[in-house]
Amino acid sequence: MNNFRATILFWAAAAWAKSGKPSGEMDEVGVQKCKNALKLPVLEVLPGGGWDNLRNVDMGRVMELTYSNCRTTEDGQYIIPDEIFTIPQKQSNLEMNSEILESWANYQSSTSYSINTELSLFSKVNGKFSTEFQRMKTLQVKDQAITTRVQVRNLVYTVKINPTLELSSGFRKELLDISDRLENNQTRMATYLAELLVLNYGTHVTTSVDAGAALIQEDHLRASFLQDSQSSRSAVTASAGLAFQNTVNFKFEENYTSQNVLTKSYLSNRTNSRVQSIGGVPFYPGITLQAWQQGITNHLVAIDRSGLPLHFFINPNMLPDLPGPLVKKVSKTVETAVKRYYTFNTYPGCTDLNSPNFNFQANTDDGSCEGKMTNFSFGGVYQECTQLSGNRDVLLCQKLEQKNPLTGDFSCPSGYSPVHLLSQIHEEGYNHLECHRKCTLLVFCKTVCEDVFQVAKAEFRAFWCVASSQVPENSGLLFGGLFSSKSINPMTNAQSCPAGYFPLRLFENLKVCVSQDYELGSRFAVPFGGFFSCTVGNPLVDPAISRDLGAPSLKKCPGGFSQHPALISDGCQVSYCVKSGLFTGGSLPPARLPPFTRPPLMSQAATNTVIVTNSENARSWIKDSQTHQWRLGEPIELRRAMNVIHGDGGGLSGGAAAGVTVGVTTILAVVITLAIYGTRKFKKKAYQAIEERQSLVPGTAATGDTTYQEQGQSPA
């Protein structure tokens, strides 16, 4: 019997250990098992992962990969997951090409061309924040150069995912967290979690990967070389090819070391050169093409990628345990988060290097290259605030209010009109002691105190003042840049204002630098072209609109001005306009990463959704009260659930329940009263019985009294 119990316990422990292992550990076990059995390497170039299409960076694993069947590529060279299939290249696919890239706007990635060229609303900024692109753009602009690129590419496999692939456990868990927030109407928290999902898994999922290796040389030449050269573009690309062949030893029979006049001129005009080995053995000077190609076998990498947007994989087939309508809401929430990521990293401006309005940081052209600047008067900013909740010790508006220095009040000076830029809610958590009396049976009372966390809220409204009529010269404020807790002032390269300027508070943490000293402050003054936000446009774009503030205005800058991001305030971007050519120096900005939405300080109360009905296919889902899992409901269960929801079942309504509670309390009070009364009456009867018993023996009582009296009189 003991042996039987021991066996049962052993198998239970083994089953628990097996079920308790994370999926990642199970994959490691499967990989090692296959490597031991087949004595083959594992193919590491795999699709099914997340991809950031702005930065060209691999992200977290979206699709689950397992190695239970120990599958191999068709040529038997590598172990591959069960959910992957490969298309081997039966013949050696060695490609060599040379190209001229005259502008960074036409740049194409060497390793993610296919996924970057997808057609979408934001495809123009795909790859614009990759290290490869930013290096090339910086060199082209700073050196006034063009780029030539020569590359040798060797494609070995095309690796694709199986359409029946399942989501990874980590990605699936994050989707379930978002769905849980959505079903409980916690939209703000769901938005925040969706933005975290984009941060961890990117914007796309790779569905196909080209595995191989590439050897690339990029040369940057003075732009004047191509313009002044009497030869054709083909001659320049040929010179680039010769330079590459001198770097990599091709060992051709024909001697390419002899340089003609054009090749020598090419080399003399080269301002920068880089050779990059992607896959294969590491590059070193003098390496032969044959040696590099032979080292590819065990050093495969991705040399191109294809994929689909992240939300495409959030569908009922991938999440069969959730109701269809809820899955669609999750997919839409994630899609919106991806669009917001693209929007906040789109920098409109003039992209023509030859234009005086050129904006180095712009990655999309907005047609502002031809505009001429107009001087505008800046009437200042101010911010109103109204406290909505909180006690007297938590005064939020003291650090949110800002008066206009030109008026000393929350207003604009004469000749200026206010532009309501944005209204938002500011939240701060605070703790306070909350005490109340707690009584039992209305008799036993005590004071109970507890430390309670609550949220104080205040609404702030930001305004800036635009000239609505002719105003006297030097009547407004000088603008000296701005900064926040996460950005610096381009005028000072620090979180500060120039000399002679003072900061005005706007939003929660933006500081706008202004000056009223036209004599000393003009040295650092910057021509200002207005503000605009995600909700309100810039009335200075059209002078006629600035006179009629009731008319809608465009969310852009007037001619001759370039836009720059001021800050992202709780998911809303606020931009400002300055004279083109200013604030565009230095290095290119990195990608602004999510989340952009603040999470709520306190979780909203759950509505405890228990049933979801899909009107399209008349299917209803019920949430199990024990397991909290969704499942398709049976007709009987649906009727029972609806009865509970609408109060038609056997349960009591709120009023009935209250009546029963009052009745039970009354009966209990009566019983307690009767018990107290009965106890007192019983004690009274017992006392009378003793008196009657004492009266039957009077001598005893008299003797006692006499003795007491005698004892009291004897001393006298």
UniProtKB/Swiss-Prot annotation:
An individual GO BP term: defense response to bacterium
Site (Cleavage): D352, L353, N357, F358, N359, F360, R631, L632
Start and end residues of each MACPF domain: 30-345
Effect annotated for changing P316S: Decreased defense response to bacterium
Keywords: Adaptive immunity, Cytoplasmic vesicle, Disease variant, Disulfide bond, Glycoprotein, Immunity, Innate immunity, Membrane, Secreted, Signal, Transmembrane, Transmembrane beta strand, Transmembrane helix, Ubl conjugation
Tagged with keyword Membrane: yes
Regions that span the bilayer: 113-120, 127-132, 235-244, 248-256, 656-676
GO cellular component, one term: cytoplasmic vesicle
Sugar-modified residues: N185, N269, N375
Signal sequence range: 1-17
Disulfide bonds: C34-C70, C350-C369, C385-C397, C435-C449, C439-C445, C534-C572, C557-C577
Regulation of its activity: Forms arc- and ring-shaped pre-pores on top of the membrane at neutral to slightly acidic pH conditions and converts to pores upon acidification. Undergoes transition from the pre-pore to the pore in a processive clockwise hand-over-hand process. In the pore state, 2 alpha-helical regions refold into transmembrane hairpins (TMH1 and TMH2) in each protomer that form in the ensemble complex giant beta-barrel transmembrane pores.
Modification comment: Proteolytically processed in two steps to generate the Macrophage-expressed gene 1 protein, processed form: cleaved by trypsin in proximity of the helical transmembrane domain releases the ectodomain into the lysosomal lumen to orient the pore-forming domain toward the endogenous membranes, and processed by the asparagine endopeptidase (LGMN). Monoubiquitinated in response to bacterial infection; ubiquitination is required for vesicular localization and antibacterial activity and can be blocked by bacterial cell cycle inhibiting factor (cif).
Tissues in which the UniProt entry reports expression: Expressed constitutively in a variety of cell types including macrophages, natural killer cells, neutrophils, keratinocytes and monocytes. In skin, expressed in both hematopoietic and non-hematopoietic cells with expression detected in a variety of cell types including keratinocytes, fibroblasts and endothelial cells.
PROSITE patterns referenced in this protein's UniProt entry, alphabetically: MACPF_2
Domain writeup: The MACPF domain includes the central machinery of pore formation: acidification causes a significant structural rearrangement, leading to oligomerization and deployment of the transmembrane beta-strands (named TMH1 and TMH2) that enter the membrane as amphipathic beta-hairpins. The P2 region contains beta-hairpins to interact with target membranes.
Family in the record: Belongs to the MPEG1 family.
Complexes and interactors: Homooligomer. Predominantly forms a homooligomeric arc-shaped pore complex instead of complete rings of 16 subunits.
Illness the protein is tied to: Immunodeficiency 77: An autosomal dominant disorder characterized by recurrent, persistent bacterial and fungal infections with multiple unusual organisms. Skin and pulmonary infections are the most common. Patient macrophages show impaired killing of intracellular bacteria and organisms, including non-tubercular mycobacteria, Pseudomonas, Candida, and Aspergillus.
Annotated function: Pore-forming protein involved in both innate and adaptive immunity. Plays a central role in antigen cross-presentation in dendritic cells by forming a pore in antigen-containing compartments, thereby promoting delivery of antigens for cross-presentation. Also involved in innate immune response following bacterial infection; shows antibacterial activity against a wide spectrum of Gram-positive, Gram-negative and acid-fast bacteria.
Protein name: Macrophage-expressed gene 1 protein
Gene it is expressed from: MPEG1
